């Protein structure tokens, strides 16, 4: 899978999910905290730049292997 760059649209820490807007302007992608790479508390900040891959989830496309850049 190819890495895609994007920006966090919003992320709800208490619910553990949010959405990423891909840099190419395509449809926002769902992101779950379990897809965030790294140790410790996994969260994303609104406006944060990230790289990720897209995988088909139960409710449509979802971001996986998410890393901050």
From Swiss-Prot:
InterPro entries: Cold_shock_CspA, Cold_shock_domain, CSD, CSD_CS, CSP_DNA-bd, NA-bd_OB-fold. This is Cold shock-like protein CspC. Keywords: Activator, Cytoplasm, DNA-binding, Transcription, Transcription regulation. NCBIfam families: PRK09507.1, PRK10943.1. Transmembrane segments: none annotated. Its main location: cytoplasm. GO terms for cellular component: cytosol; membrane. SMART domains: CSP. One of its GO terms (biological process) is regulation of gene expression. Disulfide bonds: none annotated. The gene is cspC.
């Amino acid at each position: 899978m190819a890495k895609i760059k994007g920006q966090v649209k919003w992320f709800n820490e208490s619910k553990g999910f949010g959405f990423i807007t891909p840099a190419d302007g395509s449809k926002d992608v769902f992101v779950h905290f379990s897809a965030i790479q790294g140790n410790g508390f996994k969260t994303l900040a609104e406006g944060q730049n990230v790289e990720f891959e897209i995988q088909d989830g139960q409710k449509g496309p979802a971001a996986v292997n998410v890393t901050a850049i």
